[in-house]
Each structure stands twice: as structure tokens, then as C-alpha cells.
Amino acid sequence: MRNQEIIRKAEMSLSALKSGGLMNPAQASAFIRMVQNTPTIFSESRVIQMENDSQKFEKIGFGQRILRAAQEGKALSNDELTVPTTSTVQLNTKEVIAEINITYDTLENNIEKDGLQQTIMQILAERAAVDIEELIVNGDTASADPYLAQLDGIRKQAVSHIVDMNGEELSRATFKKGLKAVPPKYLRIPQEFRFYTSHGLEVEWKDRVADRQTNLGDQAVQGGLSTAFGVPVKGVSNIQPYTVGEGDAQYDASDIILTHPKNIILGFSRNIRIEVDKDIRSRKFIIVLTAKLDSKFEEEDACAKLINVKE
């Protein structure tokens, strides 16, 4: 296929991605699924496709015992009746924008597979997912970084159960303190929770597990998923270490967040816009993606944050 034919086919494929710049519902849903399927924290979290830029989600739960001793022929008294506790999660999306460049060479390598549109969408999703994860994890409205200042991420939102490790090295006791910090009522199935931390601390824990002369040690060396008290320990690329102290007392530390993956809600507005331009001098297509999103804990009380864990 000649170069001009490739470019014409690429232009047709790119134009099919948009409708006045706005993705149609099917395209938006497909793109959101691609973002969710990337190897980020979203792959396990609860992703909600929002119809509007602002939306409330109801939470219903029973925070106390609902069963009573049954007495034949006698109904429960009024003070024995249980009323569900209700509250809402409010998501208010913030707009984010991304620009990627796809060169003609990239197109030439993919054009004859009859999957160019899918390839472009996949490239967009993979590149956007990492940046979205950075915002959802490290967002801080007090940040000097305009991108991160758009919203408070999960590290900032986790405030109810904070454990300061004061520079202690990672050990089994570290994870034990995290588990004991979360109210027991949430830990009915602890295996479904996750310890999210930096890749450095994940490697440190795998190294400690590998020292054991057991099958778990062998699995850790071979790259298997490590656990602590039955809870998987997962490294997240956007949980980065930070420096604590000064001079000789200075050290690198990181955080560990313990929560259920589905407790992290990522709200994605379906109003996703994609615009395309062509730079003939640089031989590339310029694709600009605009999306709106927000993230919250469904139950902030159901998570713990360990800070100042020595790397």
C-alpha cells in the first residue's frame, strides 16, 4: 500500500472516532473499558459511567445487628426494628486533557491489520490511564501542580485510620498494624482487600517472603503475587517514595493504603471528546482527548493508610 493511501485510510479511521468531536455512547463505553483494563489501580476498582458531570450514588447499609431472638406469636417491638443507614457519594467531575502524536510510521505498521481504529483507541487508553491514575492517587487541591490540584486523590482522602510508621523498615508487623487499624466490621473477607504501595516496597516484601524456605518463597522469586496475612500486596507505579527528615536523619519513605478495590470509585463522564489534526511537516497525526472524571472512596472508614514506611 502506497504512503498516500495509508494516510487517506488513516484519516478515514480517525474521522470515524469522532462525531463533531464528541464520542458516541458506544465509543465512550468502549474507551472507558479500555482504560479500566490497563494494568493500573482501575483494573480492580469500581468504574462508573456517569450520564452527567455531577452525580450522586446512594449507599445503604446496616451498621448494627438486625437479627433478634424469635418469640412465637409475638412481633418485634418498635425498639427492636432496624432501620438501614443511608448516605450518598457525590461525584463532581473535573476536566482533563491529553495530547498524543501518532507518526506515519506507526500507521504503516498497523494499517494493514484492518484494526487501525482499535489500535488508536488502545494507544489513547493506555497513555491516558497512567495519567488518570496519577491524578486519582496523588491528587491534592493544595498542590502547586495544576493537574494534581484539580481534586483530592485517595492518598489525601484517607484520613480516618492513619498509622505513622516513623521510618520503620517494612516487616510483617507493618501490615499487621494496617489490618488492625481498619474497623473489623469491614474485614469479613480480608483476602478481597489490597495493600497498595510503591513498587519499591512491593519488591522489599517479596524479597522478605522469598527468604522463607517455602512454596510462597519460591512463588515470590518467580514473580508471583505476594500476600501479607492473606491480603495481596500490589505495587502501584504512581505511589512514589518521598523524602523525610534532613541531613543524616534523611530517608526515603512511602505509603501503604489498605482497602477493598471496589471501595475506590472512579466516575467517568460519558461526554468524552476527541479531536484530530494533521502535521504534514512532522509526518504525524495530533490527537487531543478531553474527558471528565472524579474519584471517591465509597466508605472512607473502610481503609487505612500507613505513612513513613522506610523504602
Curated annotation (Swiss-Prot):
Coiled coil stretches, renumbered: none
GO CC, any one term: extracellular region
SUPFAM superfamilies assigned to the protein according to its UniProt record, in alphabetical order: Major capsid protein gp5
Signal peptide (from-to): 1-9
This protein's UniProt keywords: Secreted, Signal
Function: Possibly a prophage capsid protein.
Family: Belongs to the encapsulin family. Family 3 subfamily.
Protein name, as recorded: Putative prophage capsid protein XkdG
